Regions:
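A short beta-loop-alpha structural element at the N-terminal edge
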Residues: 1-13
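Conserved GNAT-fold acetyl-CoA-binding loop/helix
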Residues: 10, 14-43
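Acetyl-CoA-dependent GNAT
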Residues: 33-89, 100-101, 160-162
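Glycine-rich acetyl-CoA-binding "A-motif" of GNAT/NAT acetyltransferases
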Residues: 60-64, 125, 151
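Conserved catalytic-core motifs of GNAT/GCN5-like acyltransferases
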Residues: 69, 116-119, 131, 136-153, ...
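Conserved acetyl-CoA-binding loop-helix of GNAT-fold acetyltransferases
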Residues: 86, 92-105, 124, 128-132
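Conserved GNAT acetyl-CoA-binding A-motif
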Residues: 107-119
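Acidic/histidine-enriched, glycine/proline-rich intrinsically disordered or flexible terminal extensions
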Residues: 163-170
Length: 170
């Protein structure tokens, strides 16, 4: 089931996130992060009123999703960039898809216009999952990162939502 993240979920989130760092190009980071890092991340998300949701079964966090500001400048305030991570032992069970759909629903409910996903161009599974729910490729930055002895291309996918009825510049 999906629910809002609680502080006591952070140890399991840490494990999922560090697996993505160490074993994939889903995160362009080299070293595992600490629990203190995830606590600071959690507090920052709360301060920014950004959601963190988790998929939990039998008190085990199997995946999580979040979004945050796409860029810090005010004219971007209707655009968010999201992340979805699933524990490797629970992939292929539809958890990522459910988390993705829920984070989109939350963005829509908050009046967002655009949801962005930055996806490593070689991550075909994630790209297909995003396309399946309506994301379209909006561009690729070639050689955006370097990890595991090779240059990485970062593809951006976007989903356009209805957005606010009366957008403002403030």
């Amino acid at each position: 089931m999906i629910r809002n993240c609680r502080r006591d979920d952070l140890q399991m989130i840490l494990h999922i996130y560090n697996d993505a760092i160490v074993n994939s190009t889903a995160v362009y980071h080299y070293e595992p992060v600490t629990l203190e890092n995830r606590v600071a991340w959690y507090e920052e998300k709360k301060e920014q009123d950004c959601p963190i949701i988790v998929w939990v079964e039998d008190d085990v966090v199997m995946g999580f999703a979040t979004f945050g500001p796409f860029r810090p400048w005010p004219a971007y305030h209707y655009t968010v960039e999201h992340s979805v991570y699933v524990h490797p032992g629970y992939r292929g069970k539809g958890i990522g898809n459910k988390l993705l759909k829920e984070i989109i629903r939350i963005a829509e409910a908050r009046g967002m216009k655009t949801v962005i996903g930055g996806i490593d161009a070689s991550n075909v599974t994630s790209i297909r999952a995003h396309e399946k729910v309506g994301f379209v490729h909006s561009g690729t930055i070639r050689n955006a990162g370097y990890k595991f002895g090779k240059w990485l291309d970062l593809s951006f996918y976007q989903l356009d939502l209805e957005g606010p009825a009366s957008p403002t510049e403030g």
